[in-house]
Amino acid sequence: MVKKRLSSSDNVFKFEIPSNSKTSAEAPHSSTDSPSSVFLSSEAENGAEDRRRVSKSPTAQSPTSSVEAESPDQKRSLGLWSKSSFDGSSLLSDKNDCKTESKTDSKTERKKSSSSSQYKANMHFHKLFLDVPTEEPLRQSFTCALQKEILYQGKLFVSENWICFHSKVFGKDTKISIPAFSVTLIKKTKTALLVPNALIIATVTDRYIFVSLLSRDSTYKLIKSVCGHLENTSVGNSPNPSSAENSFRADRPSSLPLDFNDEFSDLDGVVRQRRQDLEGYSSSGSQTPESENSRDFHVTESQTVLNVTKGETKPPRTDAHGSRAPDGKAKILPAHGQSETIGILHKMESRKCPTLHHILIVYAIIVCALIISTFYMRYRINTLEERLGTLTSIMDPHSTEQTAPSGLGSQMQLNVEVLCQELTANIVKLEKIQNNLQKLLENGD
């Protein structure tokens, strides 16, 4: 950058030289001193040639002088423009260098911070869980919560051979360390309605539900990669779909037991005899009505033999189907019988339930009627007692003031006795009604 700036300043200095005579005078002395001297000598020679041309053609003097006058200004502007362009490019390059340096610095700082945080997490992990060997590094840790009677907020630590959880709630430390080889199930689930945020990790004896996972899928993938034995067991325990088909094919007969050799032996003999007869007829070349009749007889005989053989061959198939059909029916009948018995039981229960319901309703109505009657009898007894009280209150003042006649006294005594008898009779009736109610209630229970 410095060299370019110096060259541009040299060019400006060259263009500021005014006179051609001085340059022509100084040219022979400084012809080999510097590149600027070479440029000046060439300019002097060009000036001499221009003068000769001007002497030959005076009309061309004015445009050449204007061009010579304008050329220094143009060269100065070009020099300034080149300076500004060089300065702008240098500034841009400096800015780009600063940006790249800042990016690299930020990346290195991030790497340093992540490595330091990972180192701190690893140290904390080994400090909490002493069962894990110190040579085994921590792969990753996740913030989550263990779901029990309450949520225990904490961290889930995953290493190569261990899955550990630690939380401290209400001053109580809960630590769970699960060896990776003891895990029998890893399942995704969700405790919220819409957010899938939970994982189930099960062993032979325990089952843990970790909720509030921010990145459940990455956690699931990491734990799945740690528990590689689960993939092997899932592949080994995959059912063979062809086993049922093979058993079905083994139970099924390969072919139907059809023996046509014995059944169609007679038919072969008839056909051979018929061929011999036809050959004899063709050799003789003459046909008589007897031969035609015999031929018809043989044809009808062969047809009857075919019909007989068909009739004999059909029963085995029907027998085979018949022997299979009863088995199928025997297999289907128990289920049908069970369904019928279940339907009958349901009908009986549906019949029994309404009868019990009606009986309970009747008992309830009777009990209500008895309760109402007892209240009514109690009301009547209270009214009678009030009347007796009023009568006695009326009779007491008359007895104090004047003695009542003997006739009236006897009548009053009779009335009191009658009332007492009626009351005792009513009380006896009430006791009977109460006993009956108790018996009905006991029977209803």
Swiss-Prot record:
<feature type="region of interest" description="Disordered">
    <location>
        <begin position="277"/>
        <end position="331"/>
    </location>
</feature>
<feature type="compositionally biased region" description="Polar residues">
    <location>
        <begin position="281"/>
        <end position="291"/>
    </location>
</feature>
<feature type="domain" description="GRAM">
    <location>
        <begin position="123"/>
        <end position="190"/>
    </location>
</feature>
<feature type="modified residue" description="Phosphoserine">
    <location>
        <position position="265"/>
    </location>
</feature>
<dbReference type="InterPro" id="IPR004182">
    <property type="entry name" value="GRAM"/>
</dbReference>
<protein>
    <recommendedName>
        <fullName>GRAM domain-containing protein 2B</fullName>
    </recommendedName>
</protein>
<feature type="modified residue" description="Phosphoserine">
    <location>
        <position position="255"/>
    </location>
</feature>
<feature type="region of interest" description="Disordered">
    <location>
        <begin position="1"/>
        <end position="118"/>
    </location>
</feature>
<dbReference type="InterPro" id="IPR011993">
    <property type="entry name" value="PH-like_dom_sf"/>
</dbReference>
<feature type="compositionally biased region" description="Low complexity">
    <location>
        <begin position="82"/>
        <end position="93"/>
    </location>
</feature>
<feature type="modified residue" description="Phosphoserine">
    <location>
        <position position="238"/>
    </location>
</feature>
<feature type="region of interest" description="Disordered">
    <location>
        <begin position="233"/>
        <end position="252"/>
    </location>
</feature>
<keyword id="KW-0597">Phosphoprotein</keyword>
<dbReference type="GO" id="GO:0005881">
    <property type="term" value="C:cytoplasmic microtubule"/>
</dbReference>
<feature type="compositionally biased region" description="Basic and acidic residues">
    <location>
        <begin position="311"/>
        <end position="330"/>
    </location>
</feature>
<feature type="compositionally biased region" description="Polar residues">
    <location>
        <begin position="233"/>
        <end position="246"/>
    </location>
</feature>
<feature type="compositionally biased region" description="Polar residues">
    <location>
        <begin position="18"/>
        <end position="44"/>
    </location>
</feature>
<dbReference type="Pfam" id="PF02893">
    <property type="entry name" value="GRAM"/>
</dbReference>
<feature type="modified residue" description="N-acetylmethionine">
    <location>
        <position position="1"/>
    </location>
</feature>
<keyword id="KW-0007">Acetylation</keyword>
<feature type="compositionally biased region" description="Basic and acidic residues">
    <location>
        <begin position="94"/>
        <end position="112"/>
    </location>
</feature>
<feature type="compositionally biased region" description="Polar residues">
    <location>
        <begin position="56"/>
        <end position="68"/>
    </location>
</feature>
<dbReference type="InterPro" id="IPR052633">
    <property type="entry name" value="GRAM_domain_protein_2B"/>
</dbReference>
